[in-house]
């Protein structure tokens, strides 16, 4: 009888550990040709925050316990990024290189991997049309939001009117995310920039304000 409290404690601890693992998200991977053993993790959903990931000969494991759907990007040299979508109980594996990754996972991760490989397989002049088609077919996807940011909001020469049209067509939970708010702020900034450039052009000035 004396062993019952001990066995009960062990059982409770085991159950707690099992439940914890079911709520964990694990990112595993091995990336080739990394210029640093440190990868910056930039959280975009549900809120902005930063973390770091240390690699050992390109290999890494990163585990979190997300309360809700989470999105973050792996950043190397402040340039190349790999978006990752995290949810409870999921595992994602990344291989390849930082600029040509292979993402093994479910849901948004699978969707992201498919569009990454689709874009890599076509000429650069066909990428805008492919991106637009994907976004129009997946208006409630965080992958679409990422593509809008990468190929439109970060590109000064992108079609601003198309950016506005595609953004307005998005719906679902992504509309209320901080990432969407950030994208909308970029659109306002880009709109003001385009407006100022048009005024300067009409006045006979170049983009640097010189006549």
Where are these regions (language model features)?
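Helix-turn-helix repeat elements of alpha-solenoid scaffolds
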Residues: 122-128, 157-164
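Amphipathic alpha-helical repeat scaffolds of TPR domains
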Residues: 140-153
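N-terminal "domain-start" segment that seeds a small globular fold
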Residues: 181-211
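Alpha-helix capping and inter-helical loop/turn segments
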Residues: 33, 125, 155-158, 174, ...
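Alpha-helical repeat scaffolds
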Residues: 131, 160-170, 198-202
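Short solvent-exposed coil/turn linkers within tandem alpha-helical repeat scaffolds
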Residues: 137-141, 173-181
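Sec-dependent bacterial lipoprotein signal peptides
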Residues: 1-17
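A non-transmembrane, solvent-exposed segment enriched in polar/low-complexity residues
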Residues: 19-138
């Amino acid at each position: 009888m004396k062993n019952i409290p001990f066995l009960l404690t062990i059982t409770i601890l085991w159950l707690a550990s099992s439940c914890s693992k079911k709520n964990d998200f694990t990112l595993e991977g091995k990336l080739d040709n990394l210029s640093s053993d440190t990868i910056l993790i930039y959280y975009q959903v549900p809120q902005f925050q930063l973390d770091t990931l240390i690699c050992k000969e390109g290999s890494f494991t990163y585990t979190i316990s997300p309360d809700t759907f989470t999105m973050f990007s792996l950043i190397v040299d402040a340039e190349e990024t790999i978006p990752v979508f995290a949810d409870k109980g999921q595992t994602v594996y990344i291989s390849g290189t930082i600029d040509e990754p292979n993402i093994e996972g479910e849901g948004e991760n699978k969707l992201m991997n498919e569009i990454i490989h689709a874009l890599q397989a076509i000429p650069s002049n066909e990428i805008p049309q492919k991106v637009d088609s994907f976004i129009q077919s997946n208006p409630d996807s965080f992958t679409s939001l990422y593509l809008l940011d990468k190929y439109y909001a970060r590109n000064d020469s992108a079609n601003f009117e198309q950016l506005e049209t595609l953004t307005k067509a998005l719906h679902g939970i992504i509309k209320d995310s901080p990432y969407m708010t950030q994208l909308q702020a970029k659109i306002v900034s880009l709109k003001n920039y385009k407006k100022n450039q048009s005024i300067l052009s009409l006045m006979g000035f170049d983009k640097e304000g010189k006549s």
